[in-house]
């Protein structure tokens, strides 16, 4: 009499391996059934993938803006004319904290916060803002530890870059129609000066901005007028 077949036959090795690959892939996709170490590795790989994706997008937008944005190409050209050519390598894409989109350092160039841009237009405004700082540093030898110097460059950058256009202000929750642009420029300049290590109070930041307001708000170099 023939033997009864086993109630739990052993799968062929290749079928078992295929099932395990499918199970592992599903677990990685859903996060279900993973050990704590596997979950940690999954999150690490996801974060790594997002960093790479954000960096690729930031670099692509940067390349497009450097080639096709009238605002950015204008500023880059005037930096070159002023004796301070600004290559692509001086504009670095990196992840940042939530409260910033970019930055300028005389020693390191421009920081573009790859994970903080709503869209390419936001990045264009940010890059223009930082390039105005770069232009000021090149042309006017700004002492960034001097609050009046810093305030002047922040006024000019906020005024000229598009950072204070009406649509940007609406997104921030500011809806004033009367002198909205001036109010935005002053507010954002004060906030930036307040972050200067040499500034010890909001009153000091506001005073520095007010002291240079008239001359710096009307100074549109290298533009003929507000863009």
From Swiss-Prot:
Keywords: Hydrolase, Membrane, Metal-binding, Metalloprotease, Mitochondrion, Mitochondrion inner membrane, Protease. One of its GO terms (molecular function) is metal ion binding. It is found in: Mitochondrion inner membrane. It is a peripheral membrane protein. Transmembrane segments: none annotated. PROSITE patterns: ZINC_PROTEASE. Belongs to the peptidase M76 family. This is Mitochondrial inner membrane protease ATP23.
